[in-house]
C-alpha cells in the first residue's frame, strides 16, 4: 500500500514525483526486465539479433510465436517485455516502413524508423487515460549509413549500440559482451558471439527456442536463420544442453 503522498504520483502518467520520476514509466521498465532476453551485436560486416523464446508449457508450439520480427527487407526488431504491446509497435513500424518505401521508392533509414517508433512511445508518457508501452525493442538493420543497432525503452528514448541486451539477465549478457566484443569481426564471428552471449545467461536446451536474424553490409537484407541452421550452429559451439 502506497502512502497518500505517493499514491497520486504512482497512479498518474502525467504527474512527476518530487524526485522527478514518472512511476508508471519506471514500472514499464520493470516489465522489460522480466521479459525474455534479446541480444544485438554490430560488427564491420553487419548486424545480428538473437533471442530466446522460453518454453512456457510442455504443449507449447514454439513455431507459433516469433521473437524477431522482420519490419522491412533490411531491418528487423526484437522485443522484451509485454509481447502484446510489442505487437502494436511492430505493426506500427511496418506501416511506417511501408509508407516510406511507397512515397520515396527507397528503404527507410533504420534510425528514422526507430525515431518514429519512439515518438509513439513517448506520446504515451504524456497523456492521461493510457499507460506507457511495457516493452523495449532492439531495432537492427543495414541502410545507406551501414550497419545500425538501436535500443529503445518505454520512455521513448533510443540509443545506438555496438552490442547490447534487453530482458531478463541482460546485465549478465552485457558483461559477457563487454569482455568479448570487438568491432573487427566477420559475420560468422558476430553471430557466434551473439549466441555465446545469450548462452552466458540462459541454458539452451532446445534450438527451437532460439531465433537468429542477421544482415550483411554487402547484401543489405535481413535474413532469419532456419531452425536447422540454428541447431547446427548451437551444436557446433557446444551451447545446446541436454534437458
Swiss-Prot record:
SMART domains on file: Proteasome_A_N (SM00948)
Keyword Cytoplasm assigned: yes
Family named by the database record: Belongs to the peptidase T1A family.
Function, in words: Component of the proteasome core, a large protease complex with broad specificity involved in protein degradation.
Gene: psmA
GO cellular component: cytoplasm; proteasome core complex, alpha-subunit complex
Identification of the protein by name: Proteasome subunit alpha
Cellular localisation: Cytoplasm
A single MF term (Gene Ontology): threonine-type endopeptidase activity
Gene3D superfamilies per UniProt: Glutamine Phosphoribosylpyrophosphate, subunit 1, domain 1 (3.60.20.10)
Keyword Amino-acid biosynthesis: no
Complexes and interactors: The 20S proteasome core is composed of 14 alpha and 14 beta subunits that assemble into four stacked heptameric rings, resulting in a barrel-shaped structure. The two inner rings, each composed of seven catalytic beta subunits, are sandwiched by two outer rings, each composed of seven alpha subunits. The catalytic chamber with the active sites is on the inside of the barrel. Has a gated structure, the ends of the cylinder being occluded by the N-termini of the alpha-subunits. Is capped at one or both ends by the proteasome regulatory ATPase, PAN.
Keywords: Cytoplasm, Proteasome
GO biological process: proteasome-mediated ubiquitin-dependent protein catabolic process
Summary of activators and inhibitors of this protein: The formation of the proteasomal ATPase PAN-20S proteasome complex, via the docking of the C-termini of PAN into the intersubunit pockets in the alpha-rings, triggers opening of the gate for substrate entry. Interconversion between the open-gate and close-gate conformations leads to a dynamic regulation of the 20S proteasome proteolysis activity.
